[in-house]
Amino acid sequence: MPATPVEFFFDPNCPFTWRTSRWITEVADAGAATVTWRLMSLGVLNEGKEIPEKYREGVRQGGRALRALAAAQAEGGSDAVARLYTALGTRRHEKGEASDDASIAAAVAEAGLPESVAAAVDDESLDAAVRAEHEASQAAVGDTAGSPVVALEGRGFFGPVVVPAPTGDQALQLFEAVRLIAGVPAFSELKTARNPF
């Protein structure tokens, strides 16, 4: 069976999204999917809503990381986004590093991207590109949805949320299930309690 094209929309600060990204990477590495890495913003999603104080700095810093990712996208497309997101996510979600400008700059270097990508955290003109990507994620779902959004077979879905990220045969089985569900126009939701980290 040929690899299934997938668009993976993500906010880099979301720990659940990070786990799902590791799953879809496993699926792609096995040859079952080709992934186009795209951006979305929980900051844009929550505009006009009261954000608790403990999350505000994360949302602000997430916006700065998204600018760097938008610059990476302009520089080298989906492949550059994938490399930078992997470097950012490993630092933030695996090593517990702060999501600050120094960590972003280190991730940019690790991803083999030019320093201009790290400097893009201050480029407010990139906010329009982030917003356009976010709007594409919401259009794929057809409603408002958080991160991640996975689009395949002409449909977008929030999730799947996977903790921990499945590997090997389980990763492929889950992907096949998602692919099959995407082909059922009547399907809209399936949910259970989230696993703890």
Regions found by a protein language model. Name each.
Residues 12, 18-105, 177-181, 189-193, ...:
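Structural alpha/beta surface segment adjacent to cysteine/selenocysteine redox centers
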Residues 2-7:
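Extreme N-terminal starter segment of soluble prokaryotic enzymes
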